[in-house]
Amino acid sequence: MHFLLHCWLAILIFCSLDYYFLQETLQHYPENVINPIFLSSDLIVKLKNQVWDNGNAIFQPTSFQISNISSGTGAKNVVPGHLDMLFNFRFSTESTESSLRKEFESIVDSLDFDYEIEWNLSGLPYLTTENTLKDIVVNSIKKEAGIDADKNAKGGTSDGRFIAKMKTEIIELGPLNKTIHQIDECVSIADLELLKNIYLDVLKELN
């Protein structure tokens, strides 16, 4: 069993982007067509190649991902008049919500699109600098599992971002996530039993 111990976490910005071009146009009149799907390809290439930051010793570089793109009415012979894009940033402490928004909008503006953006910040990156809880957890993992924990800032968004506002030490330790968000997501019963023993030892050491 391989343990990943999350002592830090990068948080996501979720966002939707709507492009507005002309009204829907019949493809029979190509001279009147402005296709938002074609035009958005330039933006997608720019966003894919953009380096938002280089990360640091703890955090990976900020990553940008597009999760959904939709356009059109479903008609086979009508060019759509707008395009919707859903995307997110998983950002490190090297960037801020403000800097990413400014940089993103600058890229969109450079392509002369009419657009609307709706931003949604799920939380801010946090960093655990104290070692009391971390050392206890690492020692408990060594005692119960016989392995050295891999301490890193990888992983998804968690409720730890809310507790971090209390300026307390945050450690994330849970089951393996090889099947996370997949069909038939599952964990090993043996892993859960081992995890229970680790939690119990941590509680004893904290008492």
What are these regions (language model features)?
Residues F3-C7, I11, L17-N207:
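Metal-dependent amide/peptide-bond hydrolase catalytic core
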